[in-house]
């Protein structure tokens, strides 16, 4: 069908090479190759085709586009960050092989992976020299990834600095096990909770969290 439409004069570059972008996003390498051969712009919209291929884990298409000189580092290395976020480990390894470890926003790939709970990805990124930052911790904490936060705390041998606003976020989301973990690891939750958090907990009907707050003596401070 694609070949037929092109033969009928359809513009392969229409809408910023949208056809090529979709082929790259969904992994249709034969269609991607055909569109490129027909003149589709691989650099459209800041190299969007290769960024989509990387984000969705289509390594063969990433390699094909790099062979044709697409810029894997476009938009401040966003392909690497998005591949890490979506847990596309083989793509991340390949990009690192190509560009090395001196990439833009060097703590973001690990933070993005932490925000999705991808421990294997985090392990790899640590192995190539990325550091665990508070940003990575907060991404995992805010999204309720208890196992990931345990891993990050153990690896870094440090605790994140939990503010009122951070605690308020995880309370609103109902992440009771996260609150317990942080408290058990030494963060004094009962010293952070204030009347506003208590009121929000009640408003959101987070009764188990409210009971836990009572258990650790929060009411004495509000």
Curated annotation (Swiss-Prot):
Disulfide bridge partners, by residue number: none
Record's keyword annotation contains Repeat: yes
A Pfam family reported for this protein in Swiss-Prot or TrEMBL: Ank
Stored SUPFAM superfamilies: Ankyrin repeat (SSF48403)
InterPro entries: Ankyrin-KH/SAM_domain, Ankyrin_rpt, Ankyrin_rpt-contain_sf
Keywords: ANK repeat, Repeat
Protein name: Putative ankyrin repeat protein L36
Source organism: Acanthamoeba polyphaga mimivirus
């Amino acid at each position: 069908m694609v070949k037929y439409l092109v033969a009928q004069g359809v513009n392969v570059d229409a809408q910023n090479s949208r056809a090529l972008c979709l082929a790259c996003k969904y992994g249709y390498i034969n269609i991607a190759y055909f569109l490129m051969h027909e003149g589709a712009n691989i650099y459209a919209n800041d190299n969007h085709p290769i960024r989509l291929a990387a984000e969705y884990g289509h390594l063969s298409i990433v390699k094909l586009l790099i062979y044709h000189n697409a810029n894997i580092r476009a938009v401040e290395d966003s392909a690497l960050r998005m591949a890490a976020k979506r847990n596309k480990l083989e793509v991340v390894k390949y990009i690192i092989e190509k560009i090395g470890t001196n990439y833009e926003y060097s703590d973001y790939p690990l933070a993005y992976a932490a925000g999705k709970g991808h421990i294997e990805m985090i392990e790899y990124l640590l192995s190539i020299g990325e550091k665990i930052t508070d940003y990575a911790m907060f991404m995992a904490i805010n999204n309720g990834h208890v196992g990931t936060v345990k891993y990050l705390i153990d690896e870094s041998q440090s605790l994140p600095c939990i503010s009122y606003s951070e605690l308020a976020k995880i309370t609103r989301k109902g992440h009771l096990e996260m609150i317990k973990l942080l408290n058990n690891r030494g963060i004094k939750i009962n010293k952070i909770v204030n009347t506003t958090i208590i009121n929000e907990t009640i408003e959101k009907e987070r009764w188990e969290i409210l009971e836990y707050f009572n258990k650790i003596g929060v009411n004495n401070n509000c």
